[in-house]
Design a protein with these regions (language model features):
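Short secondary-structure transition/capping segments
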Residues: 55-61, 118-131, 161-179
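Short, low-complexity, polar/charged sequence segments that are solvent-exposed and flexible
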Residues: 95-99, 114-118, 152-153, 161-166
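Active-site nucleotide-donor binding segment shared across nucleotidyl transfer reactions
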Residues: 61-93, 97-110
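Catalytic cores of NTP-dependent nucleotidyl/adenyl transfer enzymes across multiple folds
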Residues: 146-188
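Short coil/turn linker and secondary-structure boundary residues
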Residues: 5-8, 27, 101, 165-171
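A short, terminal or domain-edge coil/loop segment
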Residues: 65-66, 83-85, 126-140, 173-188
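Helical scaffold of the NTase/Pol beta-like nucleotidyltransferase catalytic core
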Residues: 2-78, 133-138, 143
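Conserved catalytic core of two-metal-ion nucleotidyltransferases
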Residues: 115-151
Length: 188
C-alpha cells in the first residue's frame, strides 16, 4: 500500500492492510520497513537499492556541511534511523542543529545556498517548544530540529520522551557513509 502510493503514510498503509486482511495484530514499523526494503530491492536490484541509499545519505552529508559552513557555531547530529544509515520514504531523517543563535537566520542562509524555502513548525519537547524545519527536495527528506546548546541536546536520548536514540556527529556520519559505500562496492 505505501510502496504503491495507495497510502500516504506507513501507519495508514498498515491500517488498510489489517482492515483488508482482517488481521488483529499490527506488525511493528520495523517489520514493515524491512518488508518495504525487500520489495524495493526486488524491484530495482540490491546493488541499485544500496547505491540509492548511499546517494540519499550523501545528500544529508552535504546538507550538514552546508549548515556548518553557514552557521559555524552550530554542532550537528544525525539521529534515529538515519544515524544508523537507514533512509527511505517512510519518514524524514532527523538532524539536530545545536547552538544556532536564530533558526530563521540559519534557514535564510541555507536558502541563499540553494535549498528551497522550508516549512517550519514547532515540536513540544522536554526542553520546551522547538523550531523544526522540514526539507523535501530531491533526495533530501530531512527535519532540522533547532536545539539550544544544553547538555541534553548533545546526548543520545529523545528530546521528546527521553528514550535512547542512535545519534552520530558530522564526522562519524561521514565515516558511516564511507563504510556503506565501501561495503556496497565490495559486495556486488
Amino acid at each position: 500500500r505505501f510502496h504503491s502510493r495507495v497510502a500516504a503514510t506507513l501507519d495508514e498503509a498498515i491500517g488498510q492492510a489489517c482492515s483488508e486482511t482482517g488481521a488483529h495484530a499490527l506488525p511493528s514499523l520495523r517489520a514493515v520497513r524491512r518488508h518495504l526494503e525487500a520489495i524495493e530491492q526486488a524491484e530495482v536490484g540490491v546493488q541499485a537499492w544500496r547505491d540509492a541509499r548511499v546517494r540519499r545519505l550523501e545528500a544529508i552529508d552535504e546538507l550538514l556541511q552546508t549548515i556548518t559552513y553557514v552557521a559555524s557555531e552550530c554542532t550537528c547530529y544525525v539521529t534515529g534511523r538515519a544515524g544508523e544509515g537507514h533512509v527511505d520514504d517512510t519518514g524524514p531523517a532527523i538532524v539536530r542543529v545545536v547552538g544556532a543563535a536564530s533558526a530563521p537566520q540559519v534557514l535564510d542562509a541555507l536558502e541563499s545556498h540553494g535549498l528551497p524555502p522550508m516549512e517550519v513548525s514547532s515540536l513540544a519537547t522536554r526542553m520546551g517548544s522547538l523550531a523544526v524545519a522540514h526539507i523535501i527536495d530531491g533526495l533530501l527528506h530531512v527535519d532540522l530540529l533547532f536545539l539550544p546548546d544544553q547538555l541534553a541536546s548533545h546526548e543520545p536520548f529523545s528530546i521528546v520522551d527521553g528514550e535512547a536514540v542512535p545519534m552520530v556527529d558530522i564526522v562519524n556520519f561521514s565515516r558511516l557513509i564511507q563504510a556503506l559505500r565501501a561495503a556496497s562496492a565490495s559486495d556486488p
